[in-house]
Amino acid sequence: MTACARRAGGLPDPGLCGPAWWAPSLPRLPRALPRLPLLLLLLLLQPPALSAVFTVGVLGPWACDPIFSRARPDLAARLAAARLNRDPGLAGGPRFEVALLPEPCRTPGSLGAVSSALARVSGLVGPVNPAACRPAELLAEEAGIALVPWGCPWTQAEGTTAPAVTPAADALYALLRAFGWARVALVTAPQDLWVEAGRSLSTALRARGLPVASVTSMEPLDLSGAREALRKVRDGPRVTAVIMVMHSVLLGGEEQRYLLEAAEELGLTDGSLVFLPFDTIHYALSPGPEALAALANSSQLRRAHDAVLTLTRHCPSEGSVLDSLRRAQERRELPSDLNLQQVSPLFGTIYDAVFLLARGVAEARAAAGGRWVSGAAVARHIRDAQVPGFCGDLGGDEEPPFVLLDTDAAGDRLFATYMLDPARGSFLSAGTRMHFPRGGSAPGPDPSCWFDPNNICGGGLEPGLVFLGFLLVVGMGLAGAFLAHYVRHRLLHMQMVSGPNKIILTVDDITFLHPHGGTSRKVAQGSRSSLGARSMSDIRSGPSQHLDSPNIGVYEGDRVWLKKFPGDQHIAIRPATKTAFSKLQELRHENVALYLGLFLARGAEGPAALWEGNLAVVSEHCTRGSLQDLLAQREIKLDWMFKSSLLLDLIKGIRYLHHRGVAHGRLKSRNCIVDGRFVLKITDHGHGRLLEAQKVLPEPPRAEDQLWTAPELLRDPALERRGTLAGDVFSLAIIMQEVVCRSAPYAMLELTPEEVVQRVRSPPPLCRPLVSMDQAPVECILLMKQCWAEQPELRPSMDHTFDLFKNINKGRKTNIIDSMLRMLEQYSSNLEDLIRERTEELELEKQKTDRLLTQMLPPSVAEALKTGTPVEPEYFEQVTLYFSDIVGFTTISAMSEPIEVVDLLNDLYTLFDAIIGSHDVYKVETIGDAYMVASGLPQRNGQRHAAEIANMSLDILSAVGTFRMRHMPEVPVRIRIGLHSGPCVAGVVGLTMPRYCLFGDTVNTASRMESTGLPYRIHVNLSTVGILRALDSGYQVELRGRTELKGKGAEDTFWLVGRRGFNKPIPKPPDLQPGSSNHGISLQEIPPERRRKLEKARPGQFS
């Protein structure tokens, strides 16, 4: 592209470029002469007739940041271009097209994306990464391309650059000035884009004179990283406002969620600080309940968000970004399937930037008489343009103000509290008061000098106060010069015997725990000789850590541990001892036990007299005892993460002591205590210094106490009493062996302590513990061996040891709580699987129960009984009932064993149940050999009930013809069947074992039809015959004649003998002799052996 084309904003312009753009090179001019008339005609055409295309590039992190991508920049840019192309006022101008350009989230890639984007477009909206803003401005000015960098916090309107709205830095500064909050801190998300935004914003605020205390990044990107960032803010210089440079939680920003939850945990949302989101300045949030959907599920986040003031662009009261999106969708300018609730309000910002850039191009060309103009001219018209934005007017002197939103701690909606116009400097109330945490007021303002460009602010102090302070300091210095000696001694004495920092404790300060759990100002009962006989090295042993130990007391509400000095008579505490103890008390580290004071018992009465004349060091007490106690508790599972966490705590504690010039000298697992959070702390440090200052001789060491002692110290008792740094490293190695092997020092050597100490003191051979390579990482074992090297100079320093041990875990943090949480998570997962398995089994059993219940009762009735709903009786106008009975069942029962009768009925009714499954019938009940079925209830089926019962009866009769009893196959099984149709009432009777029963004369009549029937016959009443004939399905009935029915009199009844299309064989009814019963079996059909059994059961009946 030529230079003239670049000046034209990336488009070729015949007027600017001249013939060189239109014609071939000069040597080819003769070949072009025949076409000269056509060329002259083209040159005479007006520029608007060229139908040129102006391409607007939209550059942003659309591909690498999901929240930015939710703004749907493609739809926003195309919507703006489409509206401009349809604008009648721009007819004859260029056609606007858009190109969506991805900007990498990493800063180096962002710079490259800007360079490539400027080579492809005529105007550019972007970039978003502030690190690329200034390079983009310079490159755009060189290329002559108009630039609208909407995402840059601090952009100057010059050259080809034209900010779409007020830069974020100006808006934030105007807000801070309105409230007088000068001391601010910035917390950014760890991504490059936000880190660069924080740097650019802090630079802009500092350039305006504000004291930005810190710019902190959240790393790692979780709740712990948020806590660490806020701790830095809290522990740094005092601030009033915290600017959160990250995605807003209202748009789903997890970083801001973590930050606000951490602020709530740390108590920073109590009203002393105000939190200001940075990204909301770039788009328009509207008051209303939709904006707080992200807070609905977290009461902690709602409380924390009460400390947030949200500055955002203002839409007119009659609309919002969401309303504008709905109107565009209704006009079919946006896809109908687009979920508008999921579209970020950044949509409107992108639309406005594209629209403003394109209108600036159009107005610049119109002002130039239709000719193409430079990017600088386009930028000037953009700055002065007055155009309709997506939800309000843009540009010119009527720049839309900002609105300050707040919540009321309930989280149900956002309220507009103030309207802010940075250009005019106006800050007007919107009618709703701001709500601060706990109903308090806003943080107080900082000195006004911070916002006065003509005044130098000296840390926020007025010059008069500074002068008075100087005079006060000078006066105090002069007074101190005369009274230094006296005040020093008085203050030292008062500090040691009284006040919150006293170190001399008496029996009035310590409450000793009673051996049996009660509290008193006494020690445990026992002889003074037994207390004095305890070795100092045994003080931290396992039994002494229990609550019944006389060495445990309560001081200022906390349990403390008392370790006595050797000897029984200590008249006073020597000044050197006080000085040495004061230095030890100043040691503060999470892995070093805190020294609280020196206890001297004088004038004690009663059982407290046991401590009379005893001097003891009072230190904090840890509930889990010593490391030796913890390793002895086999019920506590110690994985490598657990062990490495304990060892890392130990290394950090020793490292701290060495940095402070303190050699422990007595380091062993009994002197390492573990608190309730499984944090290891070192105690008994500096004990040799205290003994030396108090001029007390230590007790002779026992061999059991010297297992951790370095060989050079064993050879020099004086050196052993003082201790050395290299000797602590050796002791560390022995403790590492204890933890790794979970055994006593040198336990695998099977030697007595005396033998071990002698061999360590006097090699060769070299005596060291034996540790298997599979008990810990190889690096740990190698470090252990380096630490117990024979030559002290070969042992690593504690700094080097710390670095080596950290590398064992590849830099991962080793925390016991994390290890325990992982174990709990495994247990929770196993429990969830077990619950899921049991739930599935329960659901399966429930299905079985439901299936069994629906087999016993109709489904509707069963469901009502399960829910406890009363089952009302139901009247059925027309049903057909079926009754059947086994002929001669009493005789068969007499000839059979009870189990054979049960098998007979089970086989027969299983056969019947299989048959009725293919018919629309309901099995009511079976009583003995009686079988009752109904159709037309509980589900009505019109007139089909008679046909269903008739078909079922024919199928049952056909199946009975081939049925044989297992125990008497030669005896035929005959049944009588009776059918009757009529009305009845159905309902559930009883609460215990409820039954679905039928009531009415129809039931009695059907039973009479069965009892008056004949074997292998289907006895049918006239009412049923009438329905069958009305159905006209070819049922074949024969008139039986007049039949006497009990309680009914004589009626005409019929036999059902078949149906058209029914081809199954039906058994032939037996011929009944005159006078014979239809309820029995003839003797000729009974086998002889069964007949004899029957005669025994009924003597004289068959003679």
Curated annotation (Swiss-Prot):
Disease note: Leber congenital amaurosis 1: A severe dystrophy of the retina, typically becoming evident in the first years of life. Visual function is usually poor and often accompanied by nystagmus, sluggish or near-absent pupillary responses, photophobia, high hyperopia and keratoconus.
Note: The gene names for receptor guanylyl cyclases are inconsistent between mouse and human. The ortholog of the mouse Gucy2d gene is a pseudogene in humans.
Name this protein carries in UniProt: Retinal guanylyl cyclase 1
Reported effect, P873R: In CORD6; loss basal and GUCA1A-induced guanylate cyclase activity; does not affect endoplasmic reticulum membrane localization
Protein family per UniProt: Belongs to the adenylyl cyclase class-4/guanylyl cyclase family.
CDD domains xrefs: CHD (cd07302), PBP1_sensory_GC_DEF-like (cd06371), PK_GC-2D (cd14043)
Effect on the protein upon substituting V902L: In LCA1; increases basal and GUCA1A-induced guanylate cyclase activity; inhibition by RD3 is less effective; does not affect endoplasmic reticulum membrane localization
GO CC list: endoplasmic reticulum membrane; nuclear outer membrane; photoreceptor disc membrane; photoreceptor outer segment; photoreceptor outer segment membrane; plasma membrane
This protein's encoding gene: GUCY2D
Glycosylation sites: N297
Membrane spanning stretches: 463-487
Effect of K846N: In CORD6; decreases basal and GUCA1A-induced guanylate cyclase activity; inhibition by RD3 is less effective; does not affect endoplasmic reticulum membrane localization
Impact reported for L325P: In LCA1; does not affect basal guanylate cyclase activity; reduces GUCA1A-induced guanylate cyclase activity
SUPFAM superfamilies: Nucleotide cyclase, Periplasmic binding protein-like I, Protein kinase-like (PK-like)
Molecular function per GO: ATP binding; GTP binding; guanylate cyclase activity; peptide receptor activity; protein homodimerization activity; protein kinase activity; protein-containing complex binding; signaling receptor activity
